[in-house]
Regions:
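Generic hydrophobic, helix-prone segments enriched in Leu/Val/Ile
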Residues: 7-12, 85-88, 148, 290, ...
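P-loop NTPase nucleotide-binding core
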Residues: 20-211
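The catalytic "switch" region of P-loop NTPases
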Residues: 155-320
Length: 320
């Protein structure tokens, strides 16, 4: 067993700083009791922010983690999409030859006035640069590229994107959009669902890295999956999982592990209860496809290998 604080330092040293931020990816499973898990979750999130990552927390108690799109929606709700658009826009206008004179969000009219140039020509040059930087960046899925391009155009205030369309894009990213017809003008025709949610999630860390962040750190707390029986109705809070939902959640995690070659600049830390290793009905034994990918059948009884995909942590301090 590894001390929780020591493992956070290990993750930072071996993964967050020097590997993931250079284009790598990792999916780590951490087993801990409730007391240790809560502190570890906060500590690893703080370490991620200090290392330059955007951190998103997903809890199986409040998010339906057996659906990939719901994981993406929860992550998306914790992202400041407009801030990223402004960062990308400032880089684009500078590359087009019109660096923003102030720290405020550059708009087409203000830049045209400052540089004494025609608004239409400036808009054309910046649009061309945005197209090159975003729409032709094929490391991101097409719908994601279109959405980011439209958010940048909305920030530039050229009139190409209405406030209604801007709001619809944000709602679409967060899973709150009711009618897809609101995005016809943006040329986005599909909802984010099982068929494209994984690619949307994989596009996000690339977009973050493009805009100056180290990448994306996602902390997924799956301790709720171990709850077999729902409490009385008046005591229930959040999500509970049937046997089928449990297996679907494990399949989502299995897909993340198998997709690490496609994923870049992203670290996923999955926090689980000790029952993950001991409960035959709701633990790893229930889904061999996941167990075979992370379980260490041969290991030191007194000390875990911190490089392993599955690590047991506790409150005691053990040097790693």
């Amino acid at each position: 067993m590894i001390g929780a604080d020591e493992y956070v330092e290990f993750l930072s040293r071996e993964y967050l700083r020097g590997y993931v931020d250079k284009g790598g990816s990792a999916v780590k499973f951490v087993v801990a009791d409730d007391f240790v898990a809560s502190g570890f979750r906060d500590r690893v999130a703080d370490e991620g922010r200090q290392s330059g990552y955007v951190v998103a927390a997903v809890d199986a108690a409040t998010t339906r983690v057996h659906l990939m799109e719901q994981i993406f929606f929860e992550v998306a709700r914790q992202i400041d999409w407009d801030e990223l658009a402004v960062i990308a826009l400032r880089s684009a206008v500078a590359a087009a030859g019109f660096p923003a004179p102030t720290d405020d969000t550059p708009t087409v009219d203000e830049l045209a006035s400052h540089y004494r140039t025609d608004v239409r020509e400036l808009k054309r040059d910046v649009d061309r640069e945005l197209q090159r930087r975003i729409f032709k960046d094929y490391d991101m899925i097409q719908e994601f590229r279109i959405a980011m391009l439209r958010l940048c155009q909305a920030a530039f205030r050229t009139g190409q994107v209405s406030d209604a369309e801007h709001g619809a894009i944000i709602e679409w990213l967060r899973g709150d959009l009711r009618q897809m017809s609101a995005l016809k003008s943006a040329l986005i025709y599909r909802r984010i669902a099982r068929h494209n949610a994984r690619q949307m999630l994989f596009s996000l860390p690339h977009w973050l890295a493009t805009n100056g962040f180290a990448g994306l750190l996602v902390v997924i707390d799956i301790r709720r999956l171990g709850v077999a029986r729902r409490p009385p109705l008046d005591e229930r809070a959040g999500q509970y999982y049937t046997r089928l939902g449990l297996l679907d959640a494990y399949e989502v995690l299995r897909q993340l592990i198998d997709s690490t070659d496609e994923l870049a600049r992203c670290c996923v830390v999955v926090i689980a209860a000790p029952e993950l290793l001991t409960d035959e009905a709701r633990g790893l034994d229930a889904y061999q496809a996941l167990k075979l990918r992370i379980f260490d059948e041969i290991r030191d009884r007194r000390r875990d290998n911190p490089f392993s995909s599955l690590v047991r942590i506790g409150s005691e301090e053990v040097a790693v």
